[in-house]
């Protein structure tokens, strides 16, 4: 996890440095100064990086607590049924095969079949399944779903997604404030401090840029689902993974709070055109086709 954080922080700093140098070489910084914008790009870059990463990393750090509160998930401390015993044994076996520590295992009350994994540390994660999943799927299918979630943990997907979100947040904040400065100083000729135009323009620009930037995060989310499916197939068996996805494809795919939808196994209803860009999961039929294509 530490290596992953260092890599992404270094990448982000490198990109910020390149962006800063590029703006100077292209004369954008001097142009802004000539227009009287009095904008310190280096300070703005640092500010944007701090704010951009703080939110995503804090969210990651408290992700297990948040997930439990949002779903009402109850961690299995002492199994009270054969189903709970089987869940713990299956997760433990998958975790050992994947080379990670034993995660917490929880069940949350929901009629919708779903499951999710979260946590900042791959050796101290949380895997939760809905009561609907246990009621509507057989053991082989549930085993595959658990393998899918364990693969998310083993791949470090939660950490990577949070860091990508941090990079995206940084650029959204940075560019939105540059646009706000330009409009406020150049168009409305504000000489001291910030006028209403800065705040209004920055808010609008940040909203638009955040929507566009979310496409990057959602694209990554869709790619990691294919990887988790492949990992689930390795842990539980390809046919079990395909059967689980086929069963999910025939069921309703709701039930998780919005903050956790990207971490659930269900999702990815059939969508056409531009709507596909805003999906956190690929369509079920594409995920099944990808598994069938693997040898």
UniProtKB/Swiss-Prot annotation:
Disulfide bridge map: none
UniProt: Zn(2+) binding residues: 148, 152, 225
Keywords: Cell inner membrane, Cell membrane, Hydrolase, Membrane, Metal-binding, Metalloprotease, Protease, Transmembrane, Transmembrane helix, Zinc
Entry keyword annotation includes Zinc: yes
Recorded topology in the membrane: Multi-pass membrane protein
GO molecular function: metalloendopeptidase activity; zinc ion binding
Active site per database record: 149
Location(s), subcellular: Cell inner membrane
EC number, as in UniProt: 3.4.24.-
GO-annotated cellular components: plasma membrane
Similarity field: Belongs to the peptidase M48B family.
Name of the featured protein: Protease HtpX
């Amino acid at each position: 996890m530490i290596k992953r954080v260092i890599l992404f922080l270094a990448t982000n700093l490198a990109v910020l440095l390149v962006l800063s140098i590029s703006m100077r070489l292209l004369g954008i910084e001097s142009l802004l100064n000539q227009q009287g914008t009095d904008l310190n790009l280096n300070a703005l870059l640092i500010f944007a990086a701090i704010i951009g990463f703080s939110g995503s990393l804090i969210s990651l750090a408290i992700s297990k607590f948040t997930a439990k509160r949002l779903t009402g998930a109850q961690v299995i401390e002492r199994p009270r049924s054969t189903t709970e015993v089987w869940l713990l044994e299956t997760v433990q076996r998958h975790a050992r095969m994947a080379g990670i520590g034993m995660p917490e295992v929880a069940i949350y009350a929901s009629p919708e079949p779903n499951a999710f994994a979260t946590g900042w540390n791959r050796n101290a994660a949380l895997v939760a399944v809905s009561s609907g999943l246990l009621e509507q799927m057989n053991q082989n299918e549930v085993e595959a779903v658990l393998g899918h979630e364990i693969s998310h943990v083993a791949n470090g997907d939660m950490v990577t997604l949070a860091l990508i979100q941090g990079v995206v947040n940084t650029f959204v904040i940075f560019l939105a404030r540059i646009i706000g400065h330009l409009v406020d100083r150049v168009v409305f000729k504000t000489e001291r401090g910030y006028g209403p135009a800065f705040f209004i323009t920055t808010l609008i620009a940040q909203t638009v840029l955040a929507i566009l930037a979310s496409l990057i995060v959602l694209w990554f989310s869709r790619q990691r689902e294919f990887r988790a499916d492949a990992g689930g197939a390795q842990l539980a068996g390809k046919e079990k993974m395909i059967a689980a996805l086929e069963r999910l494809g025939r069921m309703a795919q709701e039930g998780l709070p919005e903050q956790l939808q990207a971490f659930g196994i269900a999702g990815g209803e059939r969508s056409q055109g531009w709507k596909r860009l805003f999906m956190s999961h690929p369509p079920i039929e594409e995920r099944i086709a990808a598994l069938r294509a693997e040898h």
